[in-house]
């Protein structure tokens, strides 16, 4: 195993243990499933009776857990600090639902020939919409700042 892989494996083990310890403060004692996707540490928390609490409104608590793990990695000198935390496959299910909704928006734009301005969404959701729209041949543009950042779907230029 080369030095880079060893550093990533060490970061994965640290992140897994840190999240398990953090969850234990909430009375959740379980084994977090840890993998890697390129240089992103993927941490999957199995379903528990506290799913709603751990996920939070629109995934806010889950993003906070992700931030805490990433910050702990940085503060402890790990080179790899990009982390994705998913509780009970929430992100995967949300991405699937969002892709289906995006396909409906795309159909409306194609049928009307008019651009459609979407409501503000987080960066992860915008990435999904950009990808689905690109695959369907539409042009997208992100506009706004911070929590007001949103996408404009545009018909493809003829």
Language-model region placement:
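RNA-contacting regions in translation and RNA-metabolism proteins
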Residues: 1-158
């Amino acid at each position: 195993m080369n030095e880079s892989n060893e550093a990533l494996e060490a970061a994965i083990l640290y992140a897994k243990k840190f999240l398990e310890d953090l969850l234990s403060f909430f009375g959740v004692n379980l084994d977090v499933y840890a993998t890697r996707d390129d240089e992103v540490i993927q941490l999957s928390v199995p379903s528990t009776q506290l799913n709603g609490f751990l996920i939070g409104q629109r995934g806010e608590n889950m993003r906070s857990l992700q931030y805490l793990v990433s910050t702990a990695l940085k503060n402890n000198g790990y080179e790899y600090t990009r982390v994705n935390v998913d509780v009970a496959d929430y992100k995967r299910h949300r991405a699937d639902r969002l892709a289906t909704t995006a396909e409906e928006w795309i159909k409306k734009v194609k049928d009307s020939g008019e651009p459609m301005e979407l409501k503000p969404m987080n960066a992860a959701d915008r990435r999904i919409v950009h990808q689905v729209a690109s695959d369907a041949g539409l042009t997208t543009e992100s506009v706004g700042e911070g929590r007001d950042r949103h996408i404009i779907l545009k018909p493809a230029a003829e």
